[in-house]
Amino acid sequence: MHEMALMGDILNIIIEDANKKGIKQFHQVELMVGELSNAMPDALRMAFTIYKEQNPHIFSEDASLHIQYEEAI
């Protein structure tokens, strides 16, 4: 399941950028996933939940992941 590694990389980029901007905690993450990425939204949600539970100092208790899925045309 490459979604776990993918979500880890995405969150590392977000956290790095947030640190530069002085943002301390996340309440929502929005992600656009294309059909050709072969990333499964349900697996990304599961990975997000795991990272959220492992990093309570970064994510609020009610932090959520919103995925917009784009079909290939």
Roles of regions detected by a PLM:
Residues 24-36:
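Short glycine-rich, basic-tinged beta-strand/loop micro-motifs
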Residues 18-23, 57-60:
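Short secondary-structure junctions
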Residues 6-19:
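Phosphate-interacting basic helix/loop segments used at nucleotide- and nucleic-acid interfaces
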